[in-house]
């Protein structure tokens, strides 16, 4: 099963239904081709590198501090959520991203940094349907997973029919937010 590496604070915001989108450009290892959504279903692998209070909106600072206090120290990581891609859009206009600020945790400064990185590539906006796993899994962190790469393989079967996972937002609320975001993007 594929897993997408994402800041732990973002994983927490996704799990709490406080955001349903990701803004991705790609890391150093993906510079030439930019970020690609290689999988429509994947685990969310929380990372603890690079996330900082200088990059997020002030109302998410307490969430960041909570996540930092729970940073794994034993060479293991806990995966507690799973996502399915609902839609993908590419955006090159910073003003559109500013209109989406209530749907994600990043601040304007960080969005500017990400937009300016590999400036010929657009920002990918990935709308996600996120599921909280009833039985989180603990994995040994492998050295080959280190660094700025987005996708990693994790041996874990994902069952069909939402077995063992619950959507973090009920259908009506999720669809309402998707419609609001799509209105901004169109």
Task: Give each language-model segment a name.
Residues 1-186:
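Structured alpha/beta reader/binder surfaces that contact nucleic acids or chromatin modification marks
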